[in-house]
Amino acid sequence: MITKQLRSWLAVLVGSSLLALPLSGQAVGKKESRVSELPQDVLLKEISGGFSKVATKATPAVVYIESFPKSQAVTHPSPGRRGPYENPFDYFNDEFFNRFFGLPSQREKPQSKEAVRGTGFLVSPDGYIVTNNHVVEDTGKIHVTLHDGQKYPATVIGLDPKTDLAVIKIKSQNLPYLSFGNSDHLKVGDWAIAIGNPFGLQATVTVGVISAKGRNQLHIADFEDFIQTDAAINPGNSGGPLLNIDGQVIGVNTAIVSGSGGYIGIGFAIPSLMANRIIDQLIRDGQVTRGFLGVTLQPIDAELAACYKLEKVYGALVTDVVKGSPADKAGLKQEDVIIAYNGKEVDSLSMFRNAVSLMNPDTRIVLKVVREGKVIEIPVTVSQAPKEDGMSALQRVGIRVQNLTPETAKKLGIAPETKGILIISVEPGSVAASSGIAPGQLILAVNRQKVSSIEDLNRTLKDSNNENILLMVSQGDVIRFIALKPEE
């Protein structure tokens, strides 16, 4: 299939080159002679040889992972792993979605523990392995099979659900491993090579190109800056490497878009620049420390750009400033538009949010801000992002949430002025599920305190421990109060 495609592509390429020649007999003669010295078959062999070299070099470092959950009711992955559907919650009861990640059907409570199967790759000779968080979260035991068939038990070193990255480790030495390239150097149209274990078919190599960069708002993870590729990524590829033509890791494969579950040419990978920083922290500290500014932001559209007299559509609009935060101390105000930091233009809200999250605490940055039509500079010292104790309390009752952004509200048909926290997944068989809580509902208040952000949630629940949690939940025009007790 690849050979046929390449032959066709090369025929067009060579034909186009000949058509573009000057209409001079001498020039045409020289070009024809050059083409005859380098026929299509030679070009095909060179391209094919490049792919096979990458496959030969990289495949031994790619591993097959089986993760056996602690409990019979496997924690359901966050909704984003299905990609940007018209309704983000359509896929929660889809059978293929469950099979994608080795999960049991939600229509029938599992009677035995089932493994989540995926891919990972070695990043050191002493057994550190990178994969997706959703492959190894809630695990009781992990089995890793190397390319040569050797099997090892693995331990979790660190998890980061916010980027869907994880590091596990096996006890061995002198193992083959992969190195990271720089995803910032990628260009749309560059070759991309994926290696993984789709449907359990180990060491499968697929080839495509970089289709796009900087994909976000897909609801796959909290921090998104995905590489889009048409290299075939299928169920079981999760956690595998996306490589450049030099065999360097440029991304970690994490999701596909597919109405039926099959490959349709749209896959997403976490860029190596983001992944490498997260992985280094997980290996070193077992957890991720993020930078914190303390603002709630809104993306800029054409209408807002005109209202705030911006020269183009860019930047991020400050809608709220957390009291006592670095932003508050520095003097940022509601309706400030952040257009640059440290001289780098803010192309989008997600780009700026990702950049701040990857900063070390105590990093000093200079923000360029548009305030009442004037451009000013504000120095800010980034602090460490607070721990999300409230999130942990909700997770113990089986709920996962995210902030309700204007984009998500619009997609779900929620009034733009609505304040609340969006429920994105509910663990089957959990306390929340048995109480009738479902994805797509909004948490309006917790313990009689109104909440409009995860920061509000954390402040309200920080002292809850194992006490009952009283939620005020809405779905459409229906509002209910639900009392939940976190499991020990």
UniProtKB/Swiss-Prot annotation:
Region (Serine protease): 119-280
Record SUPFAM superfamilies: PDZ domain-like, Trypsin-like serine proteases
UniProt GO BP: proteolysis
SMART domains: PDZ (SM00228)
Gene Ontology CC entries for this record: outer membrane-bounded periplasmic space
Signal peptide: 1-20
Pfam families recorded: PDZ_2 (PF13180), PDZ_6 (PF17820), Trypsin_2 (PF13365)
EC number per UniProt: 3.4.21.107
Top-rank taxon: Bacteria
Active site per database record: H134 (charge relay system), D164 (charge relay system), S238 (charge relay system)
Residues that, per the record, bind substrate: G236, N237, S238, L293, G294, V295, T296, L297
UniProt GO MF annotations: serine-type endopeptidase activity
Localization per record: Periplasm
Keyword Nuclease tagged: no
Similarity section: Belongs to the peptidase S1C family.
Function: Might be efficient in the degradation of transiently denatured and unfolded proteins which accumulate in the periplasm following stress conditions.
Designated name of the protein: Probable periplasmic serine endoprotease DegP-like
Organism: Chlamydia pneumoniae (Chlamydophila pneumoniae)
